Amino acid sequence: MKLCLVAFDGRIPMLSSIVDRFEEHVSEYLGEVKVKKKRAKLPEHAYSKVRGQYLARALLDTLRGMKGEYDRVLGLTSEDLYAPGLNFVFGQARCPGREAVVSVARLLDPDPELYLERVVKELTHELGHTFGLGHCPDRNCVMSFSSSLLEVDRKSPNFCRRCTELLQRNLKRGG
């Protein structure tokens, strides 16, 4: 499977480590995965001056045009994201779909290992949505909804048994 990771603003701490860790992690569920890095500018129209945040959905629209040869395109930004009705989001995806975006703005930590773990969890979570997985009631599952860092830190980076089965079923259908 070919994934493209688009660094939206070029200021993603530890980007190479994120790509390596994410590629290794999702290969456990998707088989051989290759992640290609690209860079892109944040779309100006996505920025809300009132909120000081970027509209996540607008970034998904930008990613849609980058699909090309890739099975999935995931954006990564250091800017804070929001969705209508929410103060912020760690990420957003088309469910099901081919595009997802994650912000590292609220995932940063002085401990580089904790930061890497958080980013991989949120990338995995949003990737799961692109394969049609919804939020999971199992609070340890990577597909559980997180509205705080505490919830991100609490959950596992892994899919629970139920979500793994759903993922495999959706992959067999052509994902």
From Swiss-Prot:
GO biological process: proteolysis
Record: residues binding Zn(2+) 2: C136, C141, C160, C163
Active site positions, chain numbering: E126 (proton acceptor)
Top-level taxonomic group: Archaea
Named cofactor requirement(s): Zn(2+)
InterPro entries assigned to the protein according to its UniProt record, in alphabetical order: MetalloPept_cat_dom_sf, Pept_M54_archaemetzincn, Pept_M54_archaemetzncn_arc/bac
Gene3D superfamilies named in the record: Collagenase (Catalytic Domain) (3.40.390.10)
Disulphide-bridged cysteine pairs: none
Pfam families linked: Peptidase_M54
Residues engaged in binding Zn(2+) 1: H125, H129, H135
Known EC number: 3.4.-.-
Enzyme class: hydrolase
A GO molecular-function annotation: metallopeptidase activity
Cofactor: how and how many bound: Binds 2 Zn(2+) ions per subunit. One is catalytic, whereas the other seems to have a structural role.
UniProt keyword annotations, A-Z: Hydrolase, Metal-binding, Metalloprotease, Protease, Zinc
Family from the record: Belongs to the peptidase M54 family.
Subunit structure: Monomer.
Role, per record: Probable zinc metalloprotease whose natural substrate is unknown. Does not show endo- or exopeptidase activity against resorufin labeled casein, p-nitroanilide (pNA), amidomethylcoumarin (AMC) (one to three amino acids in length), and hippuryl-aminoacid substrates.
Protein name, as recorded: Archaemetzincin
Gene source species: Methanopyrus kandleri (strain AV19 / DSM 6324 / JCM 9639 / NBRC 100938)
